[in-house]
């Protein structure tokens, strides 16, 4: 089975999840991989796309030249991110890892129309969780069998055993973080811990303008932030897969998050899920100093993180590729 995989679809701060998937697919040996890039110049070993710069804006709308006409022979094409180029003679799989474009009213029609267009051509959309799948189905109004669930690859990271910071991952929930920050800062002072907020550039500006006294780190520094963490707090709007929280579990860092539908699906039993902001603070304090509880949290985290390792994602995608290829044209 020959698989064309777009390496430009990753949205993760810990690394390129599509490259991690590609490496795991090749290690598994279940397919012949053709790597390509829809939004950037081809790297060593990638298939070059003729007139890519011309077609790229069209592909963002699900239009333009069929991608399989620009690639070496493949049996299925897998893309992610914002580019959804059409295919002519082979099936297409589209991973949707960010739901914000479907939530934001000003952009909903464009993103929804793009996804409906590729589904109408026979594409299968991949959501990262059951909760995300339900949201995609509700927004697009398509048949349930057109949207499946495969979690993205979360990279394997070194263990963090001597971190001394309270690291807060803020993903699309900056106002929630600003409300929570004074309590986090107070807890950090009592624990003699730095409070680090890992955020986007826009969120960092909002936090600075609010006079919040925390150390700010950019998403590109996610690995460095995790290497300093003793406890991680995951603050998110639920639009993205909680890769940083899962990476923290893999690194042996106890993690706290609010008890939301997506967190209950993916993190329950491995992270501490709090019903309120006050509960978050109490969980942080206990996980900081309670060594027996930290040991239990690390063991549970390692077990859960294994479900999302690149090798697990590769196995799931190989099964999906086979199903889609067999069902093409039937």
Residue ranges and their predicted role:
Residues 1-330:
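Carbohydrate transferase catalytic cores enriched for Leloir-type hexosyltransferases
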């Amino acid at each position: 089975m020959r698989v064309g995989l777009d390496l430009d679809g990753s949205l993760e701060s810990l690394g390129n999840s599509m490259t991690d998937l590609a490496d795991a697919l090749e290690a598994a040996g279940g397919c012949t991989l053709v790597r390509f890039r829809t939004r950037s110049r081809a790297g060593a070993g990638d298939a070059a796309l003729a007139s890519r710069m011309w077609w790229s804006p069209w592909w963002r709308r699900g239009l333009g030249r069929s991608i399989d006409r620009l690639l070496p022979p493949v049996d299925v094409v897998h893309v992610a991110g914002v580019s959804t180029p059409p295919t002519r003679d082979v099936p297409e799989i589209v991973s949707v890892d960010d739901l914000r474009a479907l939530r934001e009213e000003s952009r909903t029609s464009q993103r929804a129309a793009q996804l409906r267009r590729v589904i109408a051509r026979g594409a299968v959309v991949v959501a990262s969780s059951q909760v995300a799948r339900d949201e995609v189905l509700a927004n697009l109004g398509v048949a349930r069998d057109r949207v499946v669930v495969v979690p993205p690859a979360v990279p394997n990271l070194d263990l963090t055993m001597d971190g001394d910071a309270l690291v807060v991952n803020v993903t699309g929930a900056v106002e929630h973080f600003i409300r929570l920050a004074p309590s986090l800062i107070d807890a950090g002072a009592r624990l003699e811990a730095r409070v680090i907020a890992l955020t986007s550039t826009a969120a960092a500006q909002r936090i600075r303008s609010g006079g919040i006294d925390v150390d700010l780190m950019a998403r590109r520094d996610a690995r460095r932030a995790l290497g300093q963490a003793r406890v991680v707090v995951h603050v998110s709007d639920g639009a993205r897969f909680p890769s940083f929280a899962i990476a923290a579990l893999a690194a042996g860092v106890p993690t706290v998050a609010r008890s939301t539908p997506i967190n209950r699906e993916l993190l329950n039993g491995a992270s501490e899920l709090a019903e309120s902001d006050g509960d978050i603070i109490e969980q942080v304090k206990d996980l900081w100093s309670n060594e027996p509880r930290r040991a239990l949290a690390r063991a549970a985290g390692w077990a859960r993180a294994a479900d999302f390792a690149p090798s697990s994602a590769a196995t799931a995608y190989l099964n999906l590729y086979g199903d889609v290829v067999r069902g093409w044209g039937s």
